Amino acid sequence: MYIRYYKSNKRVLMKTIGISPHRRSFLRKAVTAGPAVALVAAAGVGVAASSNTQPAYRPAYFTAAEWATLQALVDRLIPANSDGPGALEAGVHEFIDLQMNTPYAYGKLWFMQAPFVPESPPEFGYQFHMAPRDLYRSALAGLEHAVQAKLGKAFTTLDAAQKDAVIGELEQGTLAIGAVPPKTFFGQLLQNTREGYFSDPVHGGNKDMAAWKMINFPGARADYMDWVEQYGKHYPLPPASIA
């Protein structure tokens, strides 16, 4: 599902258009008509330095091959365009890697005993026997094997259209990638990509708060009382991180 968006009275409005895995605009589903962003940030995540001073990031969890595939995937979910930075510029891949060493990724935040029903509504919580970090490890290897078998190439070497087609097959559940159902992997990847793009920069993504600037989200300021009764006025201050 992807979203076409437009602004009216300084609010982001959304209209469902159709199915397309290669449009970055469907990430706007993570943003409501107001400046609220839904996040599932895990406790204990490492703090990332400012993108202006940070040295080249080295993944703490993913192998070199997994890291390259993950970057290629998130780059196609949110490619850079005139609206704002892409996933790579925003550090989404770094956010996901940092998450892999938190209680969240180990499955410590929810009930992890059978039975699991992957088709359950989101309200029923996480529904897979692998913790997120194990899911990624299995799915990324399975994806690489499936693409090699089908196209004779590594996923990272495919052109943009081919990558989008593969991601579309994951979304539709038609590309077998081993032990992890393709739809389950796509849903996990999409959710973490949204979180990394729109989360507070303290968690490693949303570099320079670029995603917040794109949607005019004010961030984590402690006090808005000076603006409560200034109806219809543009809020002029830049977004603020919790750090």
Task: Spell out what each predicted region is.
Residues A56-R58, V74-F186:
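Flexible, low-complexity segments enriched for small/polar residues
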Residues A30-A38:
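Sec-dependent signal peptide hydrophobic core
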Residues I19-S25, V40-R76:
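C-terminal segment of N-terminal export signals and the immediately downstream linker at the start
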Residues A33, R76, G196:
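Short alpha-helical functional segments enriched in proximate histidine and acidic residues
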Residues G44, G86-G91, N206-K207:
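Short, glycine/acidic-rich hinge or "gate" loops at secondary-structure transitions
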Residues M1-P21:
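N-terminal secretory signal peptides
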